Amino acid sequence: MKLKDYTIYIVTLLIVACSPSYNLQSIDDEVIAIEAPIDSTILNIILPYQNSIEAQMNEVLCISKMEMKKGKPESLLGNFVTDLCLEQFSESADVCIMNTGGIRSTLPKGKITRGEIYKLMPFENELVVLELNKSDFDGMLEYIASRGGEPFSGMKFNSSKESRELQVFSLGENFNFNKEDKVRVLTSDYLANGGDKMWFFKNKEQLKLGTKLRDAIINYCSNSDTISSKLDNRLTITEDE
């Protein structure tokens, strides 16, 4: 290092070392608006895409006969979503389960647009099927009951409120665990990977169906003039005697 450079280096260190230290006492923040003219060239590029997307989102898919909301122990919206999924993939699955938290909005009565479905299901979740043995299946039922209900389709069962004693009323046709059968469960890849504490799905092989949950809803609505749902007591939670 040259003598001149070395001298500058030493002086700089001394200045920094001898400088008084400061403590931050307060911060004042202020929003400063940046005013800039809109670039017409960029705007002309963006507008066609914006108009195309708006046209797609405003497309009317079907008419809903009722307003559908999520809720527990069962709901019109939860039953609607899981029923339509199981209907479309009945050859691959016996039951379907989703989670209330994954349903992000309500479906209004009247016109249902593509945009409404995107608000309902904004995530890119894929549909998958997993096989559960009796132990894991019972764990799934206990999970649903412990949370006061989650959206499911393809079965009906009762749970006592305190003891969590389970009684399955119906599960497919001619289904028998005595034959060491496994239940094929349709769900989202997020839940299949243990999301929302669905531990009974962990480390299970997943059959990917190549369809997003949102697309399954859109497909169903697109192929229906009208849609509706109903409550059928698929889950009842009773008081212990």
List where the protein language model places each region.
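Sec-dependent signal peptide recognition
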Residues: 4-11
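C-terminal motif of bacterial Sec signal peptides marking the signal peptidase cleavage site
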Residues: 15-17
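Feature captures C-terminal
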Residues: 21-35, 79-82, 86-95, 100-241
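Contiguous mid-protein beta-loop-alpha structural module that forms a pocket-lining wall or clamp
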Residues: 23, 40-47
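PLD-like (HKD) phosphodiesterase/transphosphatidyltransferase domain
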Residues: 34-35, 49, 53, 65-67
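Acidic/histidine-rich, surface-exposed loop or edge segments in extracytoplasmic proteins
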Residues: 55-69, 197-201
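A conserved active-site cap/scaffold subdomain adjacent to cofactor or substrate pockets
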Residues: 70, 75-76
